[in-house]
């Protein structure tokens, strides 16, 4: 038997040894997947995941490069860092309390409460309609990121980095999250029949007013 044949045989043996382990791991995952499979719509889930990526690309790098091209050369890096920092800070804020305030199961018509803070009560089987709730939360997070980033154009070249972070954090916490609940989270505006398919109210009106006030 040649050396190559021995090597091939040893490789096959090692693969067969790993097969039972892989089967056990797959068996552990099957029950949880089966529980979520009944209500899961694969096409809708795939589309929301695609949309999540597209909205994220609107901010990073889309919006950051757009604003970077409108300023003087010495301020390009500052604008890019502002957009990237907003994405990081708002992502953390969304995980901590943002999703809960915007989409928590509260009886209040003005905010969602804190029952979903740190994604409490959300697991692999949690559903939002016919898609996983984690996918829905990720999709909505991209809107929470791009909204304060839109305001950057109002103060570009005229604000400290630390002041920008503080304003965006407080503005998102006290303006964006509640308004998202009012419209998309079953709040009082939604109950009155307001329909916002693409963020015209939640994103653009709030960001526009915020930019006008801070300009």
What are these regions, as identified by a protein language model?
Residues 3-215:
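Hydrophobic alpha-helical transmembrane bundles of multi-pass membrane proteins
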